[in-house]
A protein has these predicted regions:
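Short, ordered loop/turn segments at secondary-structure junctions
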Residues: 35, 78, 97, 103-107, ...
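Active-site-lining helix/loop region of Rossmann-like oxidoreductase modules
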Residues: 8, 151-270
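Conserved active-site and cofactor/substrate-binding residues in soluble primary-metabolism enzymes
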Residues: 8, 12, 16, 67, ...
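Rossmann-fold NAD(P)-binding glycine/threonine-rich loop
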Residues: 86-87, 95, 103-130
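N-terminal glycine-/serine-/threonine-rich beta1-alpha1-beta2 phosphate-ribose binding loop
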Residues: 1-95, 215
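Hydrophobic beta-strand scaffold residues
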Residues: 29, 99, 131-132
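Alpha-helical support elements that line or immediately flank enzyme active sites
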Residues: 140-152
Length: 270
């Protein structure tokens, strides 16, 4: 018996999940919820680059909630709307449908997230008799689960440093690259990703998760953000980066244990 699955938000990440649901022999795609008029009405298969599968995208989330999907993959963009995304997922849970999501990154480790985000989800999951799971690669595997697994073959650990290096030159979400990250913008541009506290909100729970897994506790987290302008102009597949505009950024979180820098997480984006 196939598990009936709906996908909400076939964006840069959701379209990958959509294709995986379609291809999996034990999953049946029942619904596809979208936000844009450009995607509404189009076949789910078309949106992920394959033949038609007979499921048309819709902007009517309520219809999906009233349908027979057992699980909803929630992948709608949430960087600028985390509480709205939580409200969406609460509605899914209260409708008696399980949620698997990659949208609100810190919820990978909910124990380190403000209760304004976690309490509504817990209450809704209990009310609906269903489950809620947030996962991903970063976070969800590479910078949290993998370091903890590798720690099992270590005798002594003084510190752990996780570094993600990512080339955004071909990233399909232009808003994320040029507005949220602020690439191609002048140094004085107030990029969301460079706003103090944003990186700590998104990835601070990673440090707490690793610390807890190793039986210790973080006292404080320090955040630093460095932004580097381009020395010369160049083009990428998604746009032009003029000389003097931002072309790279390093965001660093340092978790202190008893005053000692013990856990460090770097994101090097360019």
């Amino acid at each position: 018996m196939s598990i009936k699955v709906a996908v909400w938000g076939p964006g840069s990440m959701g379209v990958i999940a959509l294709r995986a649901v379609i291809d999996h022999p034990e999953l049946q795609l029942t619904d596809l919820v979208v936000h844009s008029d450009a995607k509404a009405g189009r076949d789910a298969g078309e949106l992920c680059g394959i033949g038609a599968v007979g499921v048309a995208a819709t902007k009517d989330a309520a219809a999906m909630l009233d349908g027979d999907a057992e699980v909803v993959v929630y992948a709608a963009a949430a960087n600028l709307r985390p509480l709205e995304a939580v409200a969406d997922m609460v509605s899914i849970l209260r409708a008696g449908k399980n949620v698997v999501s990659c949208s609100v990154v810190p919820l990978v480790y909910p124990n380190a997230v403000d209760s304004a985000f976690t309490d509504p989800l817990r209450d809704a999951a209990l009310a609906g008799g269903v489950s809620f799971f947030t996962t991903g690669i970063d976070s969800g595997f590479a910078n949290d689960v993998l370091p903890l697994a590798l720690s099992g073959v270590s005798r002594n650990i003084d510190s752990i440093r996780m570094t993600e290096m990512f080339n955004y030159g071909t990233y399909p979400d232009r808003a994320a690259v040029y507005e949220i990250l602020g690439f191609g913008q002048p140094p004085e541009f107030a990029a969301f990703a460079a706003t103090p506290g944003v990186f700590t909100f998104g990835w601070g729970p990673v440090l707490h998760q690793i610390a807890t897994g190793l039986g210790t506790r973080i006292d404080d987290i320090a955040e630093t953000v460095e932004r580097i302008p381009a020395e010369e102009s160049f083009d990428t597949p998604t746009g032009h980066i003029a000389a003097g505009t931002i072309a790279a950024m390093r965001s660093t979180l340092t978790g202190y244990v008893d005053g000692t820098p013990t856990f460090v997480l770097d994101h090097v984006s360019r």
